[in-house]
Amino acid sequence: MKKFLLEMLICPACLPEETELRADIMIEQAEDVVEATLRCPRCASIYPIQDGTAFLGPPSDQRERTPSKYETEPVLSSYLWSHYGDLLGDEQASSAYRQWASLMDGGSGAVLDVGSAVGRFAFEMSRKRDLVVGIDNSVAFIKAARELMANGRRKLALRQEGHLSREETLTLLEGWQTDRIEFIVADALALPFRSHSFSGLASLNIIDKVPLP
């Protein structure tokens, strides 16, 4: 996780109180936090940063949960195709994320992408804003988005028929500013950010995923 985001983070378990988290950093590389523990001085909740990925869901979300389909490779590959299929030259791919991003204001300030999934909207917005933070409660989605952010490419297996699939390599567009992007595992209903941290907000495909939108 990018180190400068630490000053924006608060404890989601203490909401609506905005309690700053204290960071115990074990490993950092340049301006990235690789391994750390974030502690709340008010309620003693602990939030880990592991291999660069920050886990900032409420403590109840960090307990062992029933396996979700959104953590499986077939669903992950399906989402990667739906977000980036046009970059693979697929004639059936959608340009929706590019069009949605074109409707957002540009300029200075940060944008929060709630329910970012595997990150296409955030990458599109990196051309227009100083900072884009994507959150999702799927660990697999966030790790895939961060892999694309860090490496600029990722392999995926696209199902053809039955159990048959073909491997493709997804490569990001050069114009996307990956130094302006971060992805965090978090809950849309318990956002771990200080008030007024963002001047723009997107919540695509989220309304049907929360109990009380």
Label each residue range with its predicted role:
Residues 138:
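Conserved SAM/SAH-binding beta-strand->alpha-helix loop
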Residues 150-186:
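S-adenosyl-L-methionine
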Residues 108-117, 133:
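Conserved class I S-adenosyl-L-methionine
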Residues 87-109:
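Conserved alpha-helix/loop element of class I SAM-dependent methyltransferases that forms part
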Residues 1-71:
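N-terminal auxiliary segments of SAM/dcSAM-dependent transferases
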Residues 118-128:
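Conserved SAM-binding loop of SAM-dependent methyltransferases across substrates and taxa
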Residues 189-201:
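A short acidic, Gly/Pro-enriched loop at the edge of an enzyme's catalytic core
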Residues 210-213:
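A short, conserved alpha-helix within the catalytic core of class I
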